[in-house]
């Protein structure tokens, strides 16, 4: 039986997380994680000490037609930045965890929009 694309993506994500956990400096940085489905896009901020989600945004919150495109993914960045400001996390340094996805399309658009807001990763 042939293994699926998601199986390999998850295996890649596990390898990336293992490298992050082995580096002492990266253990103390907040992590911005993403998940994308065919219809929606999700972004989370993880606490480095408890490894729990602090806040999240998704295209489920917005009520515009099709939400699985580049425009809607990049429009989530200002929403996430507003939530960072509420939690006084805008001056922290972050790790961008792409979740095993390739850095193009929606992932790249979201990351560039976050960088435009002033988030450092």
UniProtKB/Swiss-Prot annotation:
Keywords: Ribonucleoprotein, Ribosomal protein, RNA-binding, rRNA-binding. InterPro entries: Ribosomal_uL18_bac-type (IPR004389), Ribosomal_uL18_bac/euk (IPR005484). One of its GO terms (biological process) is translation. Disulfide bonds: none annotated. It holds the Pfam family Ribosomal_L18p. The keyword rRNA-binding applies. GO terms for cellular component: ribonucleoprotein complex; ribosome. One of its GO terms (molecular function) is structural constituent of ribosome. Belongs to the universal ribosomal protein uL18 family. This is one of the proteins that bind and probably mediate the attachment of the 5S RNA into the large ribosomal subunit, where it forms part of the central protuberance. Part of the 50S ribosomal subunit; part of the 5S rRNA/L5/L18/L25 subcomplex. Contacts the 5S and 23S rRNAs. This is Large ribosomal subunit protein uL18. The gene is rplR.
């Amino acid at each position: 039986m042939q293994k699926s694309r998601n199986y390999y993506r998850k295996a890649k994500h596990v390898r990336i997380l293992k490298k992050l956990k082995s580096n002492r400096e990266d253990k103390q940085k907040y992590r911005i994680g993403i998940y994308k489905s065919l219809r929606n896009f999700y972004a989370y901020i993880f606490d480095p000490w408890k490894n729990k989600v602090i806040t999240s945004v998704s295209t489920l919150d917005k009520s515009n037609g099709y939400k699985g495109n580049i425009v809607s993914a990049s429009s989530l960045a200002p929403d996430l930045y507003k939530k960072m400001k509420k939690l006084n996390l805008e001056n922290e340094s972050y790790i961008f965890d792409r979740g095993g996805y390739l850095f193009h399309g929606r992932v790249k658009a979201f990351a560039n929009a976050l960088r435009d807001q002033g988030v450092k990763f």
